[in-house]
UniProtKB/Swiss-Prot annotation:
InterPro entries: EXS_C, PHO1_SPX, SPX_dom. This is Phosphate transporter PHO1 homolog 3. Keywords: Cell membrane, Membrane, Phosphate transport, Transmembrane, Transmembrane helix, Transport. Induction: Not induced by Pi deficiency. Residues 230-241 have a biased composition (Acidic residues). Residues 433-450, 518-533, 706-729 are extracellular. Residues 618-813 form the EXS domain. The lineage of its organism: Eukaryota, Viridiplantae, Streptophyta, Embryophyta, Tracheophyta. May transport inorganic phosphate (Pi). GO terms for biological process: phosphate ion homeostasis; phosphate ion transport. Residues 1-411, 472-496, 555-684, 751-813 are cytoplasmic.
Amino acid sequence: MKFGKEFSSQMVPEWQQAYMDYDFLKTLLKEIITFKRRTNNAPSHGGAKTGGGLNRKLTLYRAFSGLVSTPRHKRSNSSHDVEEGVQLTGSMRSGPILVNTTASHGYETTFLMAAEEGGEYELVFFRRLDDEFNKVDKFYRKKVEEVLKEAAMLNKQMDALIAFRVKVENPDGWRWEERTVEMTRLASDIATSAAALSASTPAGAKSMKVRSQEHMEAIQEGGSSRAGLMEDDEEDEDEQNETSVVSTGAIDNETTTSRMRGARPSPIDVLGRVKINNTKETPRSTIKGVLKVSKQTDLKFSRENLMKVEESLKRAFIEFYQKLRLLKSYSFLNVLAFSKILKKYDKITSRDATKPYMKVVDSSYLGSSDEVMRLMERVEATFIKHFANANRAKAMNILRPKAKRERHRITFSTGFSAGCVFSLIVALVAIIRTRNLLEMEGQKEYMNTMFPLYSLFGFIVLHIIVYAANIYYWRRYRVNYSFIFGFKQGTELGYRQVLLVGFSIGVLALLCVLANLDMEADPKTKAYQARTEILPLILLAAMFIVLVLPFNYFYRSSRFFFLTCLFHCLAAPLYKVTLPDFFLGDQLTSQVQAIRSIEFYICYYGWGDFRHRKSTCKESDVYNTFFFIVAVIPYVSRLLQCLRRLFEEKNPEQGYNGLKYFLTIVAVCLRTAYSIQKGQVAWRVLAAVFSFIAAIFCTYWDFVHDWGLLNRTSKNRWLRDKLLVPQKKVYFIAMVLNVLLRFAWIQTVLDFNFSFMHRQTMVAIVASLEIIRRGIWNFFRLENEHLNNVGKYRAFKSVPLPFNYDEDDDKDN
């Protein structure tokens, strides 16, 4: 794989704009190549023409630069002014560039051969190279500042956690003074990092105050109640051997350490300055918030609270470690990219610019700072002791989860199950045609009873396949869907796993259909009609059991994630609304017919109609009432979620979004009323009017708010500025399909009847079209969300911390 593709694949998706623009710099190099070719092919001043048989390298590069007779080894070595951060050259022969540092513009390169023919192209290249270098260095510096501040906060959290442990497990206390050597170690690292950051900042541009770092607290490295002190001696020995690299203006570590030792409070004093930050969202806490009941923030020293605090802080450390890993990767990739692009430049121009420029890169904050590495080491040590019971292997498996490998057996199983589905569909069609089942007596009863039962599995399988297609294209266009949904790293399913689940359900459902038809045709088993009717119920019960199975089989983390989001949707607005919750709520709005099929299951089997294959459900007022209710449950859930967000965020857009779902609820109720009472003109007119209004509103919201399109001032007219799919026509096709598929409801109002198609078949087709429309919506909705994250450089999740420090005490410290 070429470096450009490898570079793009290794980027943090949300930081794409902050990386070096490698592709654009390559285009500038191509312009230099084009100019050289054009120059070398032009006739010389003496009338002689360049011979076509000359060596390409000599003709294209060396003849142009005038370096053919100047061997590289004769060039004088360039000198460095380390103090000023300037790359100096003794003469033009000693190097083609001069790199210096300015307070206002950062790094600037002077191209010393701009007067040569074609030098303006190389001058443009170095100007853009400087812009990219300054951009990358500034971004990296900013992110390191952020993690240093977060590390200081985690220090305080660990102080409180250790004091909490002492209070819970050893109320009499312990000898705090004996542990001060270990407690100051991380604080020393952070103070050194802050000093190095400050010293490496150009004059007048320092954004970090050294004094603010002097009071950073240290993570106490003492053994927890669960972990022994087996590593204490080793760490003390490492501490003596550890050296700190501090630039000019750095804080003296010993002074800082002694200052912190003197200022460090005892464990009891620490607990007196903190309160529990109860971030767990429950219906009870929501109701208390509405009633303005004060939250319980006093510390209760119980093992249950200790476990909650440890789990919360454990998640915070895991997320913090992931930030450090991404920053480390960011620094390494960009330094490597600068090296690669400069080597390409040297190869094209036969100059020697890589060495002097890379010396500047290596000596810059981007290439020389080791704050991230030191923080990673300290986080690892802390996590091993306090959250992994001194088990390094266990801790590293948590901090560095292994990437999921694509297994051949999954691919084989997916392909095999897909082939089985195709074969069973062919067999089903053949049986229906050969036995002429559509013309047999009882065909209408079968379509009114068994077809709705089995169509439920069809809706589920279709939605799963559509979701698998979404995952495939999200990965193809580098939409970070696992981060957006909040999947635990290493547990997200790929499209092959999702397809395997869908095709497996499809195989079982089709086998049940064929078994049912076969038993219907066999005179020996036809008498056991009640038993044959129960096959779909058995399959549905088996699916439910697998879904709620607590054992670690069949993708347990994904199943529990789905059940959690589903419960949050049903319990709206008692839970804080997150993107996975309202995303699943939108999926449910496209599965209204499937939800009605579940209602039919309850009626058909609960009231005993399956014994006679005769449905009396529609004759029941209770069934008809719930026929209304179940259809609007997903929309009511989304409406309540919008109201919850409107109440919390005070964002009027959520009110308009809620109005959209309210109009949809009215339209669905009117269409349902008309489907029950055919021939009522009033119901028909009202259903058509409200359905049209709701469809227009929903379509506009899809395009403008959910997809971010229809922007007239965009550089991509009527779309948006940033597009992940390079073919613009895809967006216009998607908008047209969205409109056509959304208006599929029109058949319920205009009573389209086809002699060759049963009404239940028409209902199933319309429901399937809505599922397909939802799949199209899914891709562009997450694309827009991903681009919003990219615009805000949002690559991390915010993890709430378990303790809140008093503000007054923080200011004093």
